[in-house]
Amino acid sequence: MNKRSHPFASRPPVLALFQKRIDGDDALLHLASLRFKDCGLGTEFYSETPEELEKLLMFRPSTETPAAVHLKRGLDLFESGSPGMVLEFAERFRDRIFGMIIHDQTEVISHFDGYVSVLRKIDADLKSLGGSPYLFIEYAAGIEPESFTDLLKAIADLDHVSACIDIGHIGLRHIRDTFARVHNGKDIFSIKSIDPEVQDAAGEIQMAVGSALDGVLQVIEKLGRLGKPIHFHLHDGHPLAQAGAFGISDHLSFLDKIPIPFEYRGRRHLDPMFGPSGLSRLVRKSLRLLGPERTSFSLEIHPTGGRLPLGDVSFLFHHWVDKGNAERMNFWLSVLCENQKLVLKSCEKGELSEAARKDDHL
């Protein structure tokens, strides 16, 4: 089994999305750089071309903090130029990033052997570079989680290709399957918070939502046993959280609650899939199985409509007449830092429990 580790072995690196995602000029990236540096966050860039990544790396808070890049979402490894694109990123940035993330594909099901063969060829090419970053295959196409774990088992011997476990994607898939099993195939994502049936079905919805944590823990258990480095995309979600800026049900903060137009158990909100306690269990489980040297976390939380005064960074936006988007960016960055604290606290708990376990064996 491959035991190769990333270069941040003393503590698992914690990264976050490093993007604008809010309209404005490069002052927003300067703001992100300052806030990431203050928090000690690593950077996960989204880049479709090497030239785009070169520009983004100019805003990297520090060369000492870990960095990874998420390649374009529609990358199809069966297209002739795609493996070469992966190799180009690896060769050009191998001294500046430790990982590259791409989405999995539905062909994992329909062309399993062919997909594995492509990954084996990519792994051989990455190995020939020397010092190549990892290629992490993210669970994103919505296939059966069992098929995803089968894929990783089939490439367990590869040195440079491993998994990106997106806990939000896997959690939502588990919720959908759980709800459908007990409701004659009904899709929980067809329900909206304003629907009349929601109030009566709230208990059953939350029962399905509460099952997501165990579903993700099972995937971590299976893949963790392979002994390969794993990258994690961390974010929360809920089937009724469909009114966000991107119209999706996940990429929420672990501190978010889901507002509802009625009272449920004395509150006018629902809990998301994980929350801080679920996140803590996921982080500690990962560290127990993998150790910090084979674990990396990235907060993939999207912006909300909140605003936060610019304060000490207002000088970056003197040329802006309307500071609204700058304040929205500042708020989003504060959310990332708050969630980073949750992850780091969970890591500390994991370290303490591991130390206690070792003491028990002395």
Task: Please tell me what each predicted stretch does.
Residues 17-23, 46-50, 70-76, 105-107, ...:
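Active-site beta-loop-alpha junctions enriched in small/polar residues
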Residues 132-156:
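Basic- and aromatic-lined ligand-binding clefts that recognize polyanionic substrates
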Residues 2-16, 27-34, 56, 61-62, ...:
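Histidine-acidic metal/acid-base catalytic patches
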Residues 114-140:
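Catalytic cores of phosphodiester-bond-cleaving enzymes
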Residues 74-75, 104-111, 135-143, 197-209, ...:
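Surface-exposed cleft-lining segments at the edges of enzyme active sites
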Residues 109, 145-146, 306-307:
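Loop/helix-junction capping segments adjacent to catalytic residues or to phosphate/diphosphate-binding pockets
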Residues 37-114:
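Structural motif corresponding to the early beta-alpha repeats
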